[in-house]
Amino acid sequence: MASPTQGQVITCKAAVAYEPNKPLVIEDVQVAPPQAGEVRVKILFTALCHTDHYTWSGKDPEGLFPCILGHEAAGIVESVGEGVTDVQPGDHVIPCYQAECKECKFCKSGKTNLCGKVRSATGVGVMMNDMKSRFSVNGKPIYHFMGTSTFSQYTVVHDVSVAKINPQAPLDKVCLLGCGVPTGLGAVWNTAKVESGSVVAVFGLGTVGLAVAEGAKAAGASRVIGIDIDNKKFDVAKNFGVTEFVNPKEHDKPIQQVLVDLTDGGVDYSFECIGNVSIMRAALECSDKGWGTSVIVGVAASGQEISTRPFQLVTGRVWKGTAFGGFKSRTQVPWLVDKYMKKEIKVDEYITHNMNLADINDAFHLLHEGGCLRCVLAMQI
C-alpha cells in the first residue's frame, strides 16, 4: 500500500550535530523522497553507541558537520525508490551501516562481510545516486552518518543497507541488533570461531564486551575472564557469562603477565573491546603461544598504531580484526532477530535506560560517564 507521503518531502524532528562537542540541536529537518535504490524509513527507536559519541567528539577523521548521527535503530519503511524490490512500505526493518549488495567482489568472495558498493558515498556523508544528502534544514544540506542517520524521525538509506525483519519483533529491543550486540557475538562466532572448552579473555565490559562474553558462553568456553578497571561491572558481567574478573589496577605486573600466570601460559582467545592500542598489545600477548588468537573489536582513535615484538607472531599467535562481528547484514540480521525471538540470545538485558529523542544530550552524558550500557530513545519529542 502506497504511503500518503510517498514522493513528498517530509518535515520531521531530528537531533542535528552542528559542531563537535556541542550539544545536539532538535531541529525541524526536511527529508527528501528516496531516489532509485533508496529507502525512506520511519525510525521508531534508536540506541546510542560509543561510535556516535566518538564522531561527535571530533576525534573521527571521517566526521563531517553538520550531520545527523545514529546507526543502531529500528523502524518501518515509509516509501521506496525506483527499482527497490527487497522491501516495501510497511516492512519492519533495521538500518545497517554495514551494507550487503551481494554483487561486489567483497560480497561474492565468501571471505568477508565487508561490502564495497556504497562506501564511497557513506564515507563522505551522502547518497550514492547523486553524491548529495537527503537531509536539509532551511535549504542547507545536513550530512548523513554511516549511511544510516537514525537520530531523525525519518531517514533515507541505500536499499543494500536495510534488513527486513520479523514484524512481531519488538522494535524497542531489536534496534540493538544494528551494531553492538552482533559485533560482540560475531567476533566470537565468526571471526575467532571459539571452540567448546576454550579459555577466553575479554578486555572492556561495556555492551560489546558483554556480548563477547555471551557469545563465548554460548560457544562452550570453559573460562571467560573479564578485564576492566571498574569492579562494579563484575556483578553485571556474570549474568552474561563472565566467570572471573581481573582489575589491572589491583596488580603490579602488566596485565598480560597476570593473565598468563592465571591460565598456565595464556588464553586461547582474547578480545579487545575498548579501542586502546596498548590494551590491544596486552590482549595479543596474553594469548597462548602456538595457537592463541586475539581479535581487535574496539576502534582506536585516528592516527594511532599497534605494535608488538614480531616474536609474538612468529611463535604462532594470530592477530585479527572484526567489523560488525563478521555478520552479513541483510542476510544475518534477520537471523539474529529470530534467535532473539526464540530467546537464544540476550538483548533486553543490555538496555539500562529508556528516554525520548528530546533527551538525547542527557543520554550522551550517561553514555560518556559510563552510567549505562545501552540507552534506547523513542523518537517522540
From Swiss-Prot:
Keyword entries, A-Z: Cytoplasm, Metal-binding, NAD, Oxidoreductase, Zinc
Gene Ontology process terms (BP): formaldehyde catabolic process
GO cellular component: cytosol
Positions with a binding annotation for an alcohol: 51, 71
Binding site for NAD(+): 50, 204-209, 228, 233, 274, 297-299, 322-324, 374
Database matches in PROSITE patterns: ADH_ZINC (PS00059)
UniProt: Zn(2+) 1 binding residues: 49, 71-72, 179
Pfam families referenced in this protein's UniProt entry, alphabetically: ADH_N, ADH_zinc_N
Subunit structure comment from the entry: Homodimer.
Family statement drawn from the similarity comment of this UniProt entry: Belongs to the zinc-containing alcohol dehydrogenase family. Class-III subfamily.
NCBIfam families named among the record's database cross-references: adh_III_F_hyde
Name this polypeptide is given: Alcohol dehydrogenase class-3
Species for this entry: Zea mays
Lineage: Eukaryota, Viridiplantae, Streptophyta, Embryophyta, Tracheophyta
Annotated gene: FDH
